[in-house]
Amino acid sequence: MDHSNREKDDRQRTTKTMAQRNTHCSRPSGTSTSSGVLMVGPNFRVGKKIGCGNFGELRLGKNLYTNEYVAIKLEPIKSRAPQLHLEYRFYKQLGSAGEGLPQVYYFGPCGKYNAMVLELLGPSLEDLFDLCDRTFTLKTVLMIAIQLLSRMEYVHSKNLIYRDVKPENFLIGRQGNKKEHVIHIIDFGLAKEYIDPETKKHIPYREHKSLTGTARYMSINTHLGKEQSRRDDLEALGHMFMYFLRGSLPWQGLKADTLKERYQKIGDTKRSTPIEALCENFPEEMMTYLRYVRRLDFFEKPDYEYLRNLFTDLFERKGYTFDYAYDWVGRPIPTPVGSVHVDSGASAITRESHTHRDRPSQQQPLRNQPRSLTAEWFVLAPLSHPPAPT
């Protein structure tokens, strides 16, 4: 389920990561200059460690030619189930034309590691949710939702399903950058081609699949062991939107003796929670969205424009202006290269062996072991305050 085989809340796991990340990562040995500076490729200097997990570690880096900061993801070459090259391949498949995707600058060996150099982004929606006292206004959620429907439509247009919806995987741009207001989608380690590249046909419907995704947000059909398709990404987004509006979901914090029992309880609670109850006291459009995506057929192409219009029409009816004045605008946001105060004016201008996770599972054997952090979240903007318990 999460990149973790231990059933813990996302925030609990992240807390543990912060305490342990300096002891569980081996030191990568890459190309060093005569002065001992570690390099990736010809021009990326490897800096401080800002995250780690079973995949390897994450480093802040710098492009010595442009003086720009970057994120460097390192994975041992001898990993039993390497995923970094697959993720790189998916990024290349997605291309650089789509809005809200990090640029990938380099992939190649770095001593005993493979390295992927990515655009350095800002904090995740989970970080920003914490910063805003764990509640977002309807305006902010709608601005997020409208963008993420376009992100997911683009991913699907490239014959990929994402299968990893969670707030930690959606990041804003770096402050001061022209894309600072754009919600980006990252971490394609669990993505999958739903169109067979050989036959050009949709993958077949299957059952008895192991869980892939994050339990809190994944679709009901994923809990039931059904093969995922485009509909499941959209349902998971709907659950995340309600998480932002409500502050929590009814299936959070359930207790059980085993992981399997807990995941079963989460799925059972999702199925038994009427959409009307989940969306109570919120606009009817939230119910309409969830009803629509849950009724989609496995092979069916969602009507993304219909869903976007649900939210844009509501947005306009409420009299909102799409000015990117999110709830976090005006609050200081720590980043790996210093704390930045978000100015409101400036902001307005502008693979098949995964098992369970309540953050995503990472491997088999690697993907099914605990991954102790949300990868780029730490790279791109580790907040200094500890997560609150849930």
Curated annotation (Swiss-Prot):
Pfam families: CK1gamma_C, Pkinase. The modification Phosphoserine is found at residue 344. Residues 1-13 have a biased composition (Basic and acidic residues). The keyword Aminoacyl-tRNA synthetase does not apply. It is found in: Cytoplasm. ATP binds at residues 50-58, 73. Its EC number is 2.7.11.1. Autophosphorylated. GO terms for cellular component: cytoplasm; nucleus; plasma membrane. Residues 44-315 form the Protein kinase domain. It comes from the Eukaryota. Residues 15-34 have a biased composition (Polar residues). Belongs to the protein kinase superfamily. CK1 Ser/Thr protein kinase family. Casein kinase I subfamily. This is Casein kinase I isoform gamma-1. It comes from Rattus norvegicus (Rat). The lineage of its organism: Eukaryota, Metazoa, Chordata, Craniata, Vertebrata.
